[in-house]
Design a protein with these regions (language model features):
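Membrane-embedded, hydrophobic transmembrane alpha-helices
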Residues: 1-188, 664
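Transmembrane alpha-helix segments characteristic
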Residues: 16-19, 71-82, 203-207, 302-308, ...
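Hydrophobic, aromatic-rich transmembrane alpha-helices
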Residues: 54-63, 206, 283-284, 288-289, ...
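Membrane-interface helix-loop-helix junctions at transmembrane boundaries of multi-pass membrane enzymes
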Residues: 188-198, 293-300, 344-348, 383-396, ...
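Signature aromatic-anchored transmembrane alpha helix within multi-pass, membrane-resident enzymes
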Residues: 198-206, 299, 351-355, 371-378, ...
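Membrane-proximal, lumen/periplasm-facing interface regions of secretory-pathway glyco-
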Residues: 217-231, 563-616, 632-635
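Short periplasmic/luminal acceptor-recognition loop of GT-C membrane glycosyltransferases, typified by
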Residues: 603-645, 675-681
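Extracellular and organelle-lumenal recognition/adhesion modules and their flexible linkers in secreted
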Residues: 722-882
Length: 882
């Protein structure tokens, strides 16, 4: 073992280099934003805001202004909790989450006391395990309630009342006495003036927590929230129990976590699931601290929790109503139980481990790889410690508990889909059978050249190119945490061998988990979240080595410099969260919604393109409507039945099997479909996914469907059994083919920059040639037209690119009678090197009188325009492609 200065110096430098790299990556996201993600003028502002806040914390701490720092931290906590009560009326979700957590603690405390009788637990260990145990039991009870079709409010309230009476009221006096004792001890602690570290910890926590808190309080708008996590949970509540979605889709993925979500929705509305997931994030952080505290000491435990909570992946994902932090909390608790077992070899720990592992695996299959990896490595460790036979027997009991908790869901999924591990069972069988059916060319070579290299480079990729495994952000989502965890600590004598072995179990188990995930789901970062507690512990171990050495040397300067490096790492993790938020929010975080300057309807209308379309459909007469949806699988925020063609087999089959337009119209109406919803930007962005010739290569949408809604590229058509007779469209655009000029000026058009008239035309003798802003020949044109308010319009033209990578911008600016802007509607589209018809539907707002149509480009390539049209209705009078 190396105890000298060299290892400490190397570790210190490695921490400094990793922190510097994390800062560099995060600053690149701000100063050199990815063209694939929208940037905002607020990005620089947030850079300065976080820099000032972190700097202020450091200044107050070193100036010994402990009470002032504590005052500002407590004031911030009060602000974050109290303001939403008045601005977004969050009281009911608050009370719901608090009640469930309280009951969960009461139930779990009873179980933990019973199972771990005689085992010493600190108060905070007992608290964490009790809350998680109680929530798991509530999920089981909720699953039984749903299985028997008893999701009704009186039954739910009655059941919670019984649990409250049995497990809370009987203990509340003891809890209050404990709290009063803790408050008294805390007061004594403050009177003695030892509050510097408390103030620092609370201030840093608030700074890390505030973005997650604001995101969690905003209305859910992420893909999986809208397609099944919340829409499915809400559906169960509406139907009174667990039944298959009539739409099909991802409904089989709703397991234990969604049972808690359904309970929250029933009692507190759609705001509660995100709060539950955020609570699970905090429990995950708490278990990371508890592991660090048991393995090292309190300081290293705090550092491990800080490192884990600070990474952007945790801070952002934990604020949504996904369930990956549920899995992380339960699998980390599973690891904590194994640590407890390794200390006293009491099988009681493995009973709890079986429960936590069973709930984790029962809620999501992504828990499986980390459980398998951890158990495999722990079994190897027990073999070396000559306790394998005892562990093997106990592992059988633990495995039985895991199986009992998972089996009901697997049976249900098999009955619903034919795959107990939907959808990964079938996928895995296909992947494993591929080498057998393929020619005998070297599969081993293929594995070495691709999968093995990906596996080895995974820690580097997720740091330097995290978008490879997390496509929703430009990068930096795990900071440099994997680099910080480089096992230099393995060679230090400052860390006991038992601690080294257990951290190695966690890290090696994580490696096995990543390897399994690469086979099944490509080890996407969100699915890999359960491995990051162990990476954080490995990183904290390196910091622990440095601190232990500096303590012996009493080096104040180097110790404070290490402290500043940790804060710099925390600062670097705030910026990727800002860059990741690509919703239509200039401020990035939902500040206006949080402060009550924007209501829920406006927030959803601005950030969720289909929201207004959903409201429009729900307002149509006739009760609950059935909608065939192309380019959209979202189901939340509507009472209508949305059949997305991507995940509803019936809808998909109708579109691919129809022989002609008439047959499709009749069959859709026969199946109860009244409307077709098309997300035009999404359909054009992933054409391979929504390639249905009956829709985009025929006149079906014009002959048998009437366009009744168009906004933000979301189109709603009403289906008719017979062909429609539409009014003859009238093109409002003057000089639409650019045949008329007056000197260098186009007649009827306002032009700016370099404008060219070409003799190559789609129809007639002339067309307009424009170049993008990256060219020295950049130019654009517009025309103002008088229109009617609240009227659907078709805006279109023929266009042809002169080179590759050309992008055009279709833009409509709606003006009032005083020519003031009401709103703008726009979309970017790629242009090919042959003539194609480009069109865009939009609805003129109330009080609009004029519209400005723009022809402009991106990049530098030249594009020809011809036959420009703006016409009321869903057609232009020019020749269109089918």
């Amino acid at each position: 073992m190396i105890k000298g200065k060299f290892l400490v110096l190397l570790t210190y430098l490695w921490v400094a280099v990793s922190t510097g790299l994390s800062l560099y990556i995060s600053l690149l996201l701000i100063f050199r934003p990815s063209p694939l993600f929208p940037s905002s003028y607020w990005d620089i502002r947030w850079l300065w805001i976080f820099a000032i806040l972190f700097g202020s914390i450091v200044a107050l701490f070193f100036l010994a202004a402990d009470r002032l720092l504590l005052f500002f931290a407590l004031l911030s906590v009060a602000f974050l909790i109290i303001v939403p009560l008045f601005t977004i009326h969050i009281l009911l979700p608050y009370l719901t989450v608090a009640l469930i957590l309280l009951i969960g603690f009461g139930v779990g405390d009873t179980v933990i006391q019973t199972v771990l009788r005689g085992v010493h637990l600190s108060k905070i260990e007992r608290f964490a395990m009790s809350v998680l145990m109680g929530l798991g039991i509530i999920m089981i009870l909720r699953s039984l309630q749903g299985a028997f079709g008893l999701f009704f409010l009186p039954i739910t309230l009655g059941g919670l009342g019984i649990l409250f009476f049995l497990f809370v009221l009987t203990k509340i006096k003891r809890w209050i006495n404990t709290i009063l004792l803790q408050v008294e001890q805390l007061g004594q602690f403050f009177r003695e003036g030892n509050i510097a570290n408390v103030a620092l910890g609370l201030a840093v926590f608030v700074l890390l927590f505030a973005p997650s808190w604001m995101i969690a309080l905003a209305p859910p708008i992420r893909y999986d929230e809208l397609t099944y996590h919340l829409s499915g949970s809400q559906f169960y509540v509406e139907q009174g129990g667990i039944i298959p979605f009539p739409e099909g889709g991802n409904n089989p993925w709703l397991h234990y976590a969604e049972m808690l979500y359904s309970l929250g929705i029933e009692l507190g509305g759609l705001a509660t699931p995100r709060l539950f997931h955020l609570a699970m994030t905090l429990l995950s952080v708490l278990f990371v601290y508890l592991l660090g505290n048991r393995l090292f000491n309190r300081r290293t435990g705090i550092i491990a929790g800080f490192l884990f909570f600070s990474i952007p992946l945790v801070a952002y994902e934990g604020a949504t109503a996904y369930i990956d932090l549920f899995v992380t909390a339960f699998t980390t608790a599973f690891g904590f139980c194994l640590l407890g077992y390794s200390g006293d070899l009491s099988r009681r720990w493995l009973i709890l481990a079986g429960f936590f592992g069973g709930i984790g695996l029962g809620m999501k299959l992504s828990a499986g790889p980390i459980l398998v990896g951890f158990l495999a490595c722990f079994a190897v460790l027990s073999l070396f410690q000559k306790t394998f036979s005892k562990f093997l027997f106990s592992m059988g009991v633990m495995g039985s508990i895991i199986l009992i908790l998972c089996l009901p869901w697997w049976i249900r999924d098999y009955l619903w889909t034919g795959d107990p591990f939907f959808p990964y069972g079938g996928d895995l069988v296909r992947k494993l059978s591929t080498p057998i059916i393929e020619p005998a060319r070297s599969t081993q070579s293929s594995f070495i050249n691709s999968d093995l290299i990906r596996f080895i480079s995974y820690p580097i990729d997720i740091v330097l190119n995290s978008r490879k495994y997390y496509h929703e952000a430009p990068g930096g989502m795990v900071a440099t945490l994997p680099f910080l965890a480089l096992p230099l600590w393995l060679f230090s004598s400052f860390i006991p061998n038992r601690t080294k072995k257990f951290i190695l179990v966690g890290l090696c188990g994580s490696m096995i988990a990543i390897g399994v995930m690469m086979i099944v789901n490509n080890a996407l970062l969100r699915y890999a979240l359960p491995v990051f507690p162990w990476i954080a512990l490995g990183a904290a171990a390196n910091v622990h080595v440095v601190y232990k050495y500096l303590e012996n040397k009493e080096s104040w300067l180097l110790g404070n410099l290490l402290f500043l490096l940790l804060l710099a790492f925390g600062f670097s993790t705030r910026l990727p969260i800002i860059a990741r938020l690509s919703e239509n929010l200039p401020q990035r975080l939902p500040i206006n919604y949080f402060l009550g300057r924007e209501n829920r309807e406006d927030y959803l209308s601005r950030n969720l393109p289909v929201y207004d379309a959903f409201r429009f459909i729900d307002q149509q007469p006739g009760g609950r409507h059935r909608v065939l949806s192309v380019g959209n699988e979202f189901r939340l925020y509507t009472s209508s039945r949305i059949d997305g063609v991507w995940d509803v087999k019936e809808a998909h089959q109708l579109l691919i099997s129809a022989q002609n337009e008439s047959e499709l119209a009749i069959e859709l109406l026969k199946r109860g479909y009244e409307y077709i919803l098309i997300n035009q930007p999404e359909v054009e962005f992933v054409k391979w996914k929504y390639d249905y010739p009956i829709l985009n290569q025929s006149h079906f949408l014009v002959r048998y469907c009437q366009l009744i809604f168009a906004k933000n590229g979301i189109l709603v058509y009403k289906i008719f059994p017979e062909p429609l007779v539409l009014p003859q469209p009238n093109n409002l655009v003057q000089n639409e083919s650019f045949e008329e000029t007056s000197g260098d000026q186009l007649v009827a058009w306002y032009q700016d920059g370099s404008i060219f008239v070409s003799n190559e035309a789609y129809e007639g003798t002339r067309s307009l040639l424009l170049y993008g802003p990256l060219s020295d020949k950049f130019g654009w044109v517009k025309q103002k037209l008088e229109i009617e308010s609240n009227q659907l319009y078709t805006f279109g033209y023929w266009a042809k690119a002169l080179g590759n990578n050309a992008i055009l911008l279709m833009q409509l600016r709606w003006l009032d009678e005083n020519e003031n802007l009401i709103e703008s509607d726009e979309i970017w589209k790629n242009v090919e090197t042959e003539w194609n018809w480009f069109y865009w539907y939009s609805q003129s707002p109330q009080k609009s009188k004029f519209v400005e149509i723009y022809l402009s480009l991106g990049n530098s390539e030249g594009v020809l325009f011809d036959q420009v049209c703006l016409a009321a209705g869903q057609m232009c009078p020019v020749k269109e492609q089918p």
